[in-house]
């Protein structure tokens, strides 16, 4: 089969039940409004269980007590996760004070969870508090629309505090893309904000009546930082600047990390370069990519429905030509760009506008008052006096942005007293985990609760081999859906069963190579034994500046993944 047209443009066959649900939902209304009044269950029933995802929520339960409740003949302790729409991760201090209050007063866990989708989540919202949370968000100019399910999700943007003008321009585009691709249905406003039903019929000119075949993720990235991990995303706009001013974007399409254990029809994939476009075509191109995936994506198999599979089926050139046709443009050749890193610069950084930016390391993004480390209270105190904004990073950290010289000492004092500036190793700064147990229904192994002590052990190995000043990009994800982005790490652990993980090696520091499975279904002691040996070899045999992942490839420890659609599972 030629690249020109290797497979059918549209997959024929029986549609998945999710397609029926969307079609019958009356533009995402379902019977959610009626279900809210059903006090007999703490959860949502039937289609509503899935429909609430379009409104930014997932129904979960506390898995630590699930078996115990079942023995007592009680339903699981249902509660919702809510994910806010926050393009580019920028949040005002007024908004922060509102979400702090809600988390403390109206959630089971009392925490704010920063996520690597550059936003925050509330975990443990009981059904009676579901409508109030949407109304609270609306009252401060926020919403949770389209942060889950088959839509364009929260749009990421590089958290680059140094080049303030470039960041401001890129951030504006992240917001514009997010707004342009939002669903037009009034269901969200009617159900949560009590807005009147209007007589006009709903229309979805971009997303269509059955929305997208699967989730869709978009980024705006400013080289040389790849902090947003562009290759985990469907559509990526790489900022191209001239004289410090944004002039256009390189477009990369078809990244994604989710796989299914043992299912070789699934694979992680890096995004393909389509070409360069000047700024004025940005929204037309974004819409064209989304509508092409809307029409060509596989609606008969949700495990094969993402953009990465569409590209592999129809061919990159065919998909690209269709985007050009729909947008009415021709891509120019890719402009040069390179990445040098993807971690956050923890601590104070001076921007070109003479303001300072303080990046705080938040382990696993979990903001709570811990004994001796009142992180949540500390951030609230800063929010009360800070005149700039907060920025959530795609590494689950938080930037106190735009601090004038005169305010620096005051903010630093609060941060230090609250444990927000405690010294951590470079290794801990470059490690990340998804939430997993106890709230995630898909979790197979621990991630967030496992990572801190696991990194203690890794730090000990790094010290033993004399490389404590170095780091390895290390990530843990509780299941192969891959929210922890382990499939772009130098060392990635993918949960297989309680206490067991698949160990992936051979990714690189800048996040442009998918790691291959090195060992399957192993325990923490087995993982540490493997890494002890390999870190020891890296410390002795590496070349100048050579990262751990690149070393494992050069030393022949593991073959690199060159074409993941074909060789990931070899």
UniProtKB/Swiss-Prot annotation:
Gene Ontology, cellular component aspect: sulfite reductase complex (NADPH)
Superkingdom as given in the UniProt entry: Bacteria
Cysteine disulfide links: none
EC numbers for this chain: 1.8.1.2
Gene designation: cysI
Pfam families (alphabetical): NIR_SIR, NIR_SIR_ferr
UniProt cross-references to PROSITE patterns, sorted A to Z: NIR_SIR
MF annotations from Gene Ontology: 4 iron, 4 sulfur cluster binding; heme binding; metal ion binding; NADP binding; sulfite reductase (ferredoxin) activity; sulfite reductase (NADPH) activity
Residues that hold [4Fe-4S] cluster according to the record: 434, 440, 479, 483
SUPFAM superfamilies: Nitrite and sulphite reductase 4Fe-4S domain-like, Nitrite/Sulfite reductase N-terminal domain-like
InterPro entries: CysI, NiRdtase/SiRdtase_haem-b_fer, Nit/Sulf_reduc_fer-like_dom_sf, NO2/SO3_Rdtase_4Fe4S_dom, NO2/SO3_Rdtase_4Fe4S_prot, NO2/SO3_Rdtase_4Fe4S_sf, NO2/SO3_Rdtase_FeS/sirohaem_BS
Assembly notes: Alpha(8)-beta(8). The alpha component is a flavoprotein, the beta component is a hemoprotein.
Reactions that this protein is recorded to catalyse: hydrogen sulfide + 3 NADP(+) + 3 H2O = sulfite + 3 NADPH + 4 H(+)
Residue numbers binding siroheme: 483
Biological source species: Escherichia coli (strain ATCC 8739 / DSM 1576 / NBRC 3972 / NCIMB 8545 / WDCM 00012 / Crooks)
Co-factor binding comment: Binds 1 siroheme per subunit. Binds 1 [4Fe-4S] cluster per subunit.
Family the UniProt entry places it in: Belongs to the nitrite and sulfite reductase 4Fe-4S domain family.
Function according to Swiss-Prot or TrEMBL: Component of the sulfite reductase complex that catalyzes the 6-electron reduction of sulfite to sulfide. This is one of several activities required for the biosynthesis of L-cysteine from sulfate.
Protein's name according to its UniProt entry: Sulfite reductase [NADPH] hemoprotein beta-component
Pathway: Sulfur metabolism; hydrogen sulfide biosynthesis; hydrogen sulfide from sulfite (NADPH route): step 1/1
Swiss-Prot/TrEMBL GO biological process terms: cysteine biosynthetic process; hydrogen sulfide biosynthetic process; sulfate assimilation
